[in-house]
């Protein structure tokens, strides 16, 4: 660590930044412990900023899709927000859904701290996303005096699409939204965990980009994205009430995101790579050993 290797090419350096899966588990468990031990003010600050950043990334994606007529362009651009959140060390509850429970499983934190983190960060996301939404709505409507911007109707349509079709079919709608949320956070949790698979910034960015682009391109349900889209749509006149928002989208999406992170990502990876021998010790991710020749390029 810290040794200069001037003779290596950039490709060789990228190979050396790869972290083995068993060491990856050490890193994410340690991260889960760190997240559970944050103070409430830290959680509030990090969660609020993350909510606002993800709202901004969503508007970038919607703007790109609107301008090009190609939703896939928006999906490719959306991960900029996720990358900023991870690299800045902020709190994104959909990622924490995969990390903190593993720390609880290993007895390195407790359920009370886990629930506190989830609750405080979710509330902070709502504040950050809604604040950004209010500022963005004010900007594109010229303080409520103009509604000709194409983004107005794009956001209203998306907000209504995230609530009304589920409500229209009743119980089947709840099942559908939970499944969409589970599939979404399968990818988001992979994005969170895979960011620990490289010790280089470039490697982290590339690794995160792939699964996050996948979820957004499929039109799945992400709780924090919806904390921006639906309130912003309501501010712009979407035919949605607070009860409809929470009953037919936000609450079931949070449940689905938690289940997806745990059942589809965290637990399968944990039980695939964790053994008694490599069970986590209190080693921070920054000192996880690197292996130079682990990939066949």
Regions found by a protein language model. Give the residues of each.
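Alpha-helical transmembrane segments and their helix-helix packing motifs
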Residues: 14-297
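Short, Lys/Arg-enriched N-terminal segments with co-localized hydrophobic residues
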Residues: 1-15
